[in-house]
């Protein structure tokens, strides 16, 4: 690169600056994520366009033909004998990134597609009864050819 007149450090700096700007624009279009704060993690969402989706699957095969952010929720029942114990939670692969919450608390995040996710619900969060898992799944599409 240097022999062609490019300065690697400046190109890397430019890349990171433009990627940060792109991601800020991307996040600004997510109604569930305002000013860096997730909005839909504390309670099971109903109405307001929330529809069931059979998973696992690429959401494009379920009628959502776009790249961007999709929020998923699932109400689960924590058995009494699991109460107060750490629980391992496994997700299938997500294309591309996720942030996962349990009862409003972030329990994990992973960047990159084709990566299995294993998160832990802490013993303090594991209480008998109903709980809500919320996943912010982000599919960036092809970053080189799209706008946010």
Labelled PLM ranges:
Residues 23-53:
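Predominantly extracellular/luminal regions of secreted and cell-surface proteins
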Residues 40, 50, 76, 81-104, ...:
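Aromatic-lined ligand-binding clefts that engage carbohydrates, nucleic acids, or primary amines
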Residues 66-79:
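Short beta-strands within extracellular/lumenal beta-sheet-rich domains
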Residues 72-74, 115-119:
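Short strand-edge motifs at loop-to-beta-strand transitions and within beta-strands
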Residues 107-108:
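Short hydrophobic beta-strand segments in globular cytosolic domains
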Residues 145-148:
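Conserved small/polar residues in nucleotide/adenosyl-binding loops
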């Amino acid at each position: 690169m240097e022999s062609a007149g490019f300065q690697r450090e400046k190109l890397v700096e430019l890349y990171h600056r433009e990627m940060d700007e792109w991601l800020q624009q991307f996040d600004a279009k997510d109604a569930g994520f305002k000013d860096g704060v997730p909005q839909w993690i504390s309670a099971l969402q109903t109405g307001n366009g929330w529809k069931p989706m059979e998973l696992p699957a690429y959401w494009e095969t379920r009628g959502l033909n776009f790249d961007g952010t999709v929020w998923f929720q699932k109400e689960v029942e924590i058995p009494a004998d699991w109460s107060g114990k750490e629980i391992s939670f496994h997700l299938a692969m997500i294309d591309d990134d996720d942030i996962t919450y349990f009862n409003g608390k972030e329990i994990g995040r992973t960047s990159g597609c084709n990566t299995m996710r294993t998160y832990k619900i802490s013993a303090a969060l594991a209480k008998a009864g109903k709980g809500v898992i919320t996943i912010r799944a982000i599919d960036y599409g092809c970053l080189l050819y799209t706008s946010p």
